[in-house]
UniProtKB/Swiss-Prot annotation:
It comes from the Bacteria. This is Bis(5'-nucleosyl)-tetraphosphatase PrpE [asymmetrical]. It comes from Oceanobacillus iheyensis (strain DSM 14371 / CIP 107618 / JCM 11309 / KCTC 3954 / HTE831). InterPro entries: Ap4A_hydrolase, Bis(5'-nucleosyl)-tetraP_PrpE, Calcineurin-like_PHP_ApaH, Metallo-depent_PP-like, MPP_PrpE-like, Ser/Thr-sp_prot-phosphatase. Transmembrane segments: none annotated. GO terms for molecular function: bis(5'-nucleosyl)-tetraphosphatase (asymmetrical) activity; GTP binding; nickel cation binding; phosphatase activity. The gene is prpE.
Length: 250
């Protein structure tokens, strides 16, 4: 099985398309396909903050529907799903950019994109365990003792990470560095916490290299075990990145 796992896109369509071309995907029959039958895996948070969330939804929906990609929801995806269901959610932390795009559409197009995203979300797994290659893709990661579970505790961890319930001075949730204590045999590939370079620790790989915050969009290729990145077109915001050499908690 040959896969390309792509980090948090956050509405950065141009960077995503550039990365797909760099990975060797070409547009065929109206969508991206690879001559070597590779498949794409999205680690979640495909929307919010970036300029083209609606177009990214359409692209990911099409790829998944045609069985050319897998999609794993992230915390931003969960919030957008609840918004589309009619629940009251706070339109901030990036959601406001997606809802603004959504409201600019005609009612017909709004209905279309809403139903596409709901279908995409509801048909996707909480996390993806590819047992034949011993790889697990989970948005914010998953510790060894939760692998195989899908209860509320597991869902919270997979979407938000190992949260403490506390916040730092900037309002960001403080998270424990779960990867430092992971000792499982399966490789865990995840995103959620922006880092300047992919972080490899104890069979865990963080590939959220903060494209929407001006750094780069990264893919991890398997079985090659190599990283492929493209530069971001967004403004660089240094304070959005975690330096684990300075602190093991976020």
């Amino acid at each position: 099985m040959k896969i390309d796992i792509i980090g948090d896109v956050h509405g950065c369509l141009e960077e995503l398309e550039e990365l797909l071309f760099k990975l060797g995907y070409q547009i065929k029959n109206g969508t991206y396909q690879h001559s070597n039958n590779r498949q794409i895996v999205f680690v979640g948070d495909i929307t919010d903050r970036g300029p083209d969330s609606i177009k990214v939804i359409k692209l990911v929906y099409q790829l998944v529907k045609e069985k050319l990609a897998y999609y794993i929801p992230g915390n931003h995806c969960n919030k957008l799903y609840r918004f589309f269901q009619g629940n009251k959610v706070m339109e901030k932390h990036g959601l406001e950019t997606t809802t603004a795009e959504y409201r600019s559409l005609s009612k017909e197009k709004q209905n279309n994109i809403k139903h596409k995203f709901i279908e995409l979300y509801e048909r996707s797994p909480l996390y993806l365990h590819l047992k034949n290659i011993n790889v697990i893709i989970a948005h914010a990661g998953i510790p060894e003792h939760l692998i195989g579970k899908k209860d509320k505790r597991t869902k919270t961890f997979v979407l938000y990470g190992d949260i403490t319930g506390e916040f730092d001075t900037t309002g960001k949730p403080i998270r424990r560095d779960w990867a430092k204590h992971y000792h499982g045999d399966s490789w865990i590939v995840y995103g959620h916490t922006p880092v300047l370079e992919p972080r490899v620790v104890n069979h865990t790989i963080n590939i959220d290299t903060g494209c929407v915050f001006g750094n780069k969009l990264t893919a991890y290729r398997f079985p090659e075990k190599e990283f492929v990145s493209v530069a971001s077109r967004q403004p660089f915001i240094a304070e959005k990145f975690t330096d684990f050499n300075v602190s093991n908690e976020h």
